[in-house]
A protein has these predicted regions:
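Glycine-rich portal/gate segments that line the openings of hydrophobic small-molecule binding cavities
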Residues: 26, 46, 55-101, 124, ...
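Extracytoplasmic/secreted proteins, especially bacterial periplasmic and envelope-associated proteins
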Residues: 33, 43-46, 141, 145-148, ...
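Hydrophobic pocket/interface hotspot
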Residues: 33-38, 44, 80, 117-119, ...
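Beta-strand/loop substructures that line and gate deep hydrophobic ligand-binding cavities in soluble
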Residues: 94-148
Length: 160
């Protein structure tokens, strides 16, 4: 199943901005239910295996501040600003050395009971760090992240 699931994940560079990588996957879930599931930040450690712990530090309306502790010990502070009417989850990393934001949109699939998840990840390194990290390296990391997260979403919803 892993091989066919991986084949269903499409990852490509944005036509609009060389700092954005996009991707698509179809998951087995109603789009509203899938969006609501991913909005539950506590479930991110079950959806994304590289996340060990989730701490919601603030939640107000469609905005939230969340800290993810990854299995490698890396801590990520994230600001969410979601758009429920568009079934869009948008978030930015607030503590890194790079400017990083991502969005996931949950669109009803062609077949009943499916959802197409479209994601965009922007990452750009500025300042002194930019002298040591090439654009190609950042592009590779973006591509790996988009592919991995879409695969994780697909695997999670295949089981639930």
């Amino acid at each position: 199943m892993a091989a066919s699931a991986a084949a269903d994940v499409s990852v490509y560079e944005s036509h609009d901005d060389h700092s954005i990588t996009e991707g698509d996957v179809v998951i087995v879930a109603d789009s509203d239910a899938a969006y609501d599931t991913v909005l539950d930040y506590a479930k991110w450690s079950a959806i994304f295996p590289d996340i060990k712990q989730v701490t919601v530090t603030k939640k107000q309306g469609d905005d939230a501040r969340v800290t993810f502790l990854h299995v490698d010990g890396n801590k990520e502070n994230v600001h969410f600003h979601n758009t429920p009417a568009a079934r869009m989850i948008w978030f930015e990393d607030t503590g890194g050395r790079a400017e990083v934001w991502a969005e996931m949109v949950f669109v009803p699939g062609e077949k009943s009971g499916t959802t197409r998840v479209h994601t965009r990840v922007y990452a750009s390194v500025h300042g002194v760090t930019g002298l040591f990290v090439s654009d190609d390296k950042v592009k590779t990391l973006r591509t790996q992240r988009v592919r991995s997260e879409l695969h994780d979403l697909q695997a999670y919803f295949a089981k639930h």
